[in-house]
Structures are given as structure tokens and as C-alpha cells.
């Protein structure tokens, strides 16, 4: 496959499916803990370590400060993720040497986990819902905005603008693409559920072993 890099200052995305999940980086093992993808974050979500919500307590936390320090530290590591699946086209794309290149529309998946970016990328969907429009009917133009840190360093956040003047007519091909994205999500969720079941079984086996070790051997003597 061609592994060359293509660059663009802005892109148009067409979102077919939006889902939500929790994610946390496990620095000890160098892996990510991820939950199921769901329509929202209102319920508890199984994760691939056999827990819920990447370790975050179930339900609403009434008093965060009352939690143990290790739990507070864990919760701060957990990110809300807005998962966008759809098509992307790069605008005025160039290669590493700055030469203009033509790039076909490509499928994409974007896990938006930065807190500010999570909010920014939610605004187009709120606007479309108010106008009773489907996300797949419009292109969202995404750019970037520089933000300064107190140290003088910079970081960038996405910007998002919806083109409401042009509406995309849905085709049979779009229906198939939508089905493909849903199938991908279902396969991902199946993997998470299987991992959850496996880890839960391991935990139960370990607990059973500890219980057996705690048993007291009782010998019943026979008649003399």
C-alpha cells in the first residue's frame, strides 16, 4: 500500500454514523482500555478489561472530592469519546514536497477525545437536529485553530462549519455504506463483549480459587 503522507489545511467530512464511548490509556501495559460504542453515555458500558466505563464508578458521581485519591486519579484519565464514521475529502491536498495531489473520497473513523474538540464537533449535529436534517445530508468543513499554552507552546483544535445551502440526496450506495459502518461497529462491540466476558471469567476463577484456599478441612472420624 502507498504509505506516503498527504496534507491539507482543511477537509470536508460527511458523517454517516455517530457513537460514544469511554477510553483510557493504560501506561503500565502500553494499551488502551475501551468500552462499547453506544448511542450516548447515559448508561454503563462494558470495557475490554472486564469492568464498566474503563473503571469509572457506575451512575452519577454525587461528590467527586469524597472519592479515594486513586479513584479520582483514574477518573481524570478517562476520556469521553465522540466517534464519527463517514467519508472525508481533503481540500487543496499536497504531498510532503508541497505538490498538489488529487485524493479520492475515503472512508474514515475519528475518535474525538479532547474535551474542547468533543464539544466543538458536537455543535454541527445540534444545528442539524434543530433543522431536522440528517448528518449524512451535509458536508462539514473542518479546519484547525491554534491555541497558546502559558509555556508559549501551541496546540490545535478543530473547527467545524456546516454547509446548509447544499443538501446531498441519498442513494442506494449510501444505504450500503451506512450498513457497512453499522456492521463495523457491531464487530467492534462484539470484540469488547467477548473481552469483557473473558476477563470476568478469569476474575471469577481467581475469586473461586481464593475461596477454596479459605476452606477449612474437616475430618469426620468414624466409629471406633
Language-model segments: residues:
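Short helix-loop boundary/capping segments
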Residues: 91-131
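OB-fold ssDNA-binding interfaces and closely related basic DNA-contact patches used
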Residues: 1-102, 149-155, 163-169, 212-224
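Short His-Asn-centered micro-motif
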Residues: 86-87, 111-113, 140-143
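Alpha-helical protein-protein interaction elements
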Residues: 8, 12-17, 102, 110-113, ...
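Long, compositionally biased interface segments
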Residues: 123-224
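Short linear motifs at secondary-structure transitions and domain/linker junctions
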Residues: 51-63, 114-119, 133-138
